[in-house]
Regions:
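Metallo-beta-lactamase
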Residues: 1-36, 42-110
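Generic structural signal for short, solvent-exposed loop/turn connectors between secondary structure elements
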Residues: 1-4, 24, 48-53, 66, ...
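Active-site-proximal loop/helix segment associated with metal-binding centers of metalloenzymes
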Residues: 2-10, 58-71, 122-124
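Glycine-rich, flexible loop/turn motifs
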Residues: 15, 21, 65-68, 112
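Soluble or luminal CAZymes and related metallo-dependent hydrolases
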Residues: 74-81, 119, 173-177
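Active-site/pore-lining binding-face segments in mid-to-C-terminal subdomains
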Residues: 80, 85-146
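C-terminal regulatory/interaction regions
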Residues: 129-201
């Protein structure tokens, strides 16, 4: 975390406030609405102000001219909730979407969300099929890294695709998707994977 974000300073407990879905934060003259958007994590919120949404991880990772990808991470990955959260963001009809990884999406927010939505399904189903086939976790990590890297390069106009892949791996390491998917399929849909793989350790 320090490599990515620098030193994280402690926040006094009396300055921490838990927000509920739909709660409005008054920062005069601004009113910012917190919207619960689980899927990446159960506590995740996006923040809506005027025609802008500060999307957090649920809105995907997108670097430069690369595509939006979903940061699948353990332990709280939940695919159905992720789709519901994307639908919530889409319904806001925002003109600007701000991503923590990284930057501002403007004028193509709907396209960004559609591409992210499609990739959530495609990646989760690819991982499910490999888990169902009893692929060992170490091999699955390697296979998924190759799959993701090929996906990043497909149709990309980036000339330095290796550099782009390195940047994506730094921001969102592909091995975390394997850990997140294993737990998700084992916990929520054990009937869709093999019996041998369907028990959480």
């Amino acid at each position: 975390m320090e490599k990515l974000w620098g030193r994280i300073a402690a926040v006094p407990a009396d300055r921490v406030k838990t927000l509920e879905d739909g709660e409005v934060i008054q920062l005069s003259p601004f009113e910012i609405r917190a919207i619960a958007t689980p899927g990446h994590a159960s506590h995740h919120h996006v923040y809506h102000w005027d025609d802008s949404v500060f999307g957090g991880d649920i809105a995907g990772v997108r670097i430069g001219l690369g595509p939006p990808i979903p940061p699948f991470v353990p332990p709280e990955l939940h695919i159905e909730q992720w789709h519901d959260s994307i639908a919530k963001i889409r319904a806001l009809n925002a003109r600007h979407l701000y991503l923590p990884h990284f930057g501002k999406i403007e004028g193509e927010v709907s396209d960004h969300l559609a591409a992210l939505d499609e990739r959530v399904d495609r990646w989760s189903e690819w991982l499910r099929d490999k888990i169902q086939a009893s692929m060992k976790e170490d091999k699955l990590r390697s296979a998924f890294a190759t799959y993701e890297h090929d996906d990043l390069g497909m149709g990309s106009s980036v000339t330095n695709i290796e550099g782009l892949i390195t940047d994506y791996e730094t921001a969102d390491p592909s091995h975390m998707a394997v850990s997140g998917a294993l737990r998700y399929w084992q916990k929520y849909h054990p009937d869709q994977i093999s019996t041998e793989q369907s028990t959480l350790s």
